[in-house]
Structure formats: structure tokens, C-alpha cells
Regions:
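Glycine- and other small-residue-rich loops at beta-strand/loop junctions that grip anionic moieties
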Residues: 81-82, 108, 112, 137, ...
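Secondary-structure boundary/capping positions in well-ordered alpha/beta enzyme cores
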Residues: 74-75, 133, 162, 184, ...
Length: 307
């Protein structure tokens, strides 16, 4: 019997690379241990933060197998098994399930912009090939695929998906889907800038950059909203997180120059946790000119920053 989907915060674990793009999997275990010690409820290997787009299929399998072995059931694992190809997505999904994944995170086929009906068939075929829940990674800005609420509800009714990571700045859609399914379809806030509103609407959890970068701070916010129902405390915690979010997403929202969200994330993790290395090109490391600002923001959130 598959495990139910999780409630809480989910960190998208990073993939450590060395020179020339070689995997450095010895670094992955300490990173996963740190995330769990920080209090995350789930981990998603090979989400966006895992740089799956930079990896060959066999390397993705190595990361999934290593992560699942190291996590060893301590938290829920939402394995990222996305690929443009339905065939390869099924291959990766079956591999993840066979190695103990609790659920799957799958972004719609990207770049070629298939029609909504083709995207829905993609998910149906994957669901037929596995017996664990699928979390549909709804990310319009990065996939150019916009499944409307009716499409998502249809997939849920057909049991093709069990959850949605909503990575669009539309907290009202989180509310709409939760109301339409009596909160039975798990909906996760998937973009940091609207996570507060999404959690207040009743989202089951939060999967995004902040839970992956400063998990303890993200968990405190989730608990304040979802468990304690203490909005005064939640607003205070959100206000403390906001400057880090602004730094992390300045280039993402402007589509211009500035700190890339992933450069900021890896730099932060190197400052406060086990070393994880730099992003794979074309994403460059965080500029030295921003590292002092980032270090101060992390200290303001209660983290000890390594010199």
C-alpha cells in the first residue's frame, strides 16, 4: 500500500557536481542529513534545485538511488522523474519506485509545448506504469504549459495525479482547487513569493527554494500557519524571510541581470551547511559582491555562517 502524500515543508535537494560535470555523490549524504536535521518533512531529489536538466538519464538514476539509500525512510521522498519524453519519464519513475520512493514529482513536457490533451495523456501513461502518487509540477513560466483547473481536476478524478506543486504566482488557484476537491487533492505552494498566501488558503505544504535553502526558518513559518494558526507570529516570520526571497528571485522575476535564484541557494548552503559546490554552467556562482549581503541575511534568520 503506497504511503499517503505528506504535509509540511519539502526541500528540493541539490546535486553536487565536480569538475567537468562529474557527480560527487559523496557530498550528497551529508547534505541530506543536514536537511533532515533542519526539520524538513520531505525531500525531493532531482527537483529544479537538483539540476536534472543538466544530467543524463543514467546520472539521474545514480542520484535517485543514492538519495533513497541515504534517506532510508527517515522522511517522505518525492522523487523528481521528469523528462520531456514520456518513455524516459516512465523509465525514471519505475526506477524511483523500485528503489523506495514514496511519490513522484513530474513537470509537464517542456520546450515543444504539447497541447493540454497531450500533456494529460503524458500523466495518464505514467500513472498507469507506477503505483505511487504523482505530484504534478505546475510551472507555467518554465514550461509554457498551462493546464487549467478543469484539466487538473480531471486528472485527479481519474487518479492520474495525487497532488500538485503550484509554482505560479496564483494563490487563488490553490484555494480554488482545494475547495473543488474538499482538500483531498494535495496542493503545495511551489513559489516562495506567494507561499504565505497559499498556506493561509490551506495548502498542504511548501516545496520551493526557501525550504531548500533555510529549511528551519521555512518549517517555523509552516507550523505557525498550519499548526498553531498564529498569524501574528507567521507575519513576523514572513517579514524576516522576505529580504532573502527578494535577493534570491531578483533575476527570476525581472528576467534581467542580478542574483540567480539557484546561485543564491547554493551559495547559502555552502555558508551554513555541508559544502555542495557551485551550479553547473551556464548558471554562474553567486558574484562576490553579493556574498556579504547573503551572509547577513542568513545571520538575521539565526544561522551561523562559516567564515
Amino acid at each position: 500500500m503506497p504511503k499517503p502524500l505528506f504535509h509540511g515543508v519539502c526541500a528540493s535537494s541539490i546535486t553536487p557536481f565536480g569538475s567537468q560535470g562529474a557527480l560527487e555523490l559523496t557530498r550528497l549524504g551529508p547534505h541530506l542529513d543536514w536537511l533532515i536535521a533542519e526539520g524538513v518533512d520531505a525531500i525531493s531529489p532531482l527537483g529544479s534545485s537538483g539540476e536534472f536538466v543538466a544530467m543524463e538519464c543514467e546520472d539521474r538514476k545514480k542520484v535517485l538511488a543514492t538519495a533513497l539509500e541515504k534517506i532510508a525512510g527517515r522522511v517522505h521522498v518525492v522523487a523528481g522523474t521528469h523528462d520531456y519524453s514520456t518513455r524516459r519519464t516512465i523509465e525514471l519513475s519505475q526506477f524511483a519506485q523500485s528503489h523506495g520512493a514514496d511519490s513522484l514529482l513530474i513537470v509537464p513536457p517542456y520546450y515543444m509545448a504539447p497541447t493540454p490533451s497531450q500533456v494529460m495523456d503524458h500523466y495518464r501513461r505514467i500513472a498507469e506504469s507506477v503505483s505511487i502518487p504523482i505530484v504534478l509540477y505546475h510551472n507555467i513560466p518554465l514550461t509554457a504549459v498551462d493546464l487549467k483547473t478543469d484539466h487538473l481536476l480531471k486528472l485527479y478524478e481519474e487518479k492520474a495525479i495525487g497532488g500538485i506543486k503550484m509554482s505560479n504566482p496564483e494563490p487563488d488557484r490553490i484555494c480554488e482547487i482545494l475547495q473543488a476537491t474538499d482538500s483531498q487533492l494535495h496542493v503545495y505552494a511551489g513559489i516562495d513569493t506567494v507561499a504565505f498566501e497559499g498556506l493561509c488558503h490551506g495548502a498542504h505544504g511548501w516545496i520551493s527554494g526557501i525550504p531548500s535553502t533555510v529549511p528551519r526558518a521555512a518549517k517555523e513559518l509552516y507550523v505557525a500557519i498550519a499548526v498553531e494558526k498564529n498569524l501574528d507570529r507567521a507575519r513576523l516570520l514572513w517579514t524576516k524571510l522576505a529580504p532573502l526571497m527578494r535577493l534570491q528571485f531578483q533575476a527570476y522575476h525581472s528576467r534581467g541581470e542580478g542574483a540567480h535564484w539557484f546561485s543564491t541557494m547554493k551559495a547559502a548552503l555552502n555558508m551554513i551547511g555541508p559544502p555542495v559546490g557551485d551550479p553547473e554552467p551556464p548558471i554562474a556562482p553567486l558574484p562576490e559582491s553579493l556574498r556579504g549581503t547573503l551572509a547577513k541575511l542568513l545571520r538575521d534568520l539565526g544561522y551561523t555562517v562559516k567564515s
